């Protein structure tokens, strides 16, 4: 198994920090959390059960359908696009290595061990990464973080004191356990200042670029 880890590290070319975390951090047991820079943690993701996450194939199809142009572009769109791109590449390299091992390893028991390890261990971590970054791009990072905290609160609360159903990300504003609320008071506009509509003021406000 150590040889398998070594082959994976050599074959998985990782030009960014995010992919290096995926390929090296977990395999070598380094204390590196690939979610920390996005405000989450591996522990927070671990509260979601394994069957919560769609298959890698479904997640890859979703990423391709929604963000293919940005993922294939040479432009930097956002840290989530970069992390998603590198996770997809690393999974492709992992599958290539698994196929090579499956073809060239003669011992059926050893071959089954490698396949099971990839599917059960690395597969789950890749599914978690893909789900997290796709969800952040789709719903917004703050919404996803609120959902993770809400699910953590829900699952840690005794059944007698919590709602019967877990929070759902797509309906988070209505079902979240922990959510920020805007102040209900209406702000009164000040009559003493008027925004200038001069051409110079309009030219100074350049729109932000987005992918």
From Swiss-Prot:
InterPro entries: Hepatitis_B_virus_capsid_N (IPR013195), Hepatitis_core (IPR002006), Viral_capsid_core_dom_sf_HBV (IPR036459). Residues 165-211 are annotated as: Disordered. Residues 25-27 are annotated as: HBEAG. GO terms for molecular function: DNA binding; RNA binding; structural molecule activity. Keywords: Disulfide bond, Host nucleus, Host-virus interaction, Repeat, Secreted, Signal, Viral immunoevasion. GO terms for biological process: microtubule-dependent intracellular transport of viral material towards nucleus; symbiont entry into host cell; viral penetration into host nucleus. Residues 183-211 form a propeptide. Sequence repeats lie at residues 183-189, 190-197, 198-205. This is External core antigen. It comes from Woolly monkey hepatitis B virus (isolate Louisville). The gene is C.
